[in-house]
Amino acid sequence: MEIYSSPQQYLYNLETLSSAEAKRLWRRKIKQMWNYECAYCGAHSHLTIDHIVPRSKGGIDFTKNVVSCCYDCNQDKAHTPWEEWYFSQEFFSLNRYKKIKEWMKPDPPVNLFLYRPRRNNCT
């Protein structure tokens, strides 16, 4: 099963029939994509989901805006812009920083044509 862009996509694709279960499934898939470790410090315990751009600052519940995060990092970061907060941490890792930046990149546009469109030969 793939990871969808939001909990609502799990409902739309009939992976589940309740919004609560869709959100649980979405959160579980995000943690799985991060190998069940905190995106910031690498801890494996007390994992939560963190909005990279906090909802209070306009962040949304989309996969590209959330990462697997330990409880301590989530509480410490709070509403601080993530880069400002992360650069000030003693556990800062350039590799983890790059991985988060890569995660945040939008997906490439989907090619809607499954086959080459026909040319109109009428001239």
Model-based region annotation:
Residues K57-D72, Q89-M104:
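Short microdomains enriched in Cys/His and/or Lys/Arg
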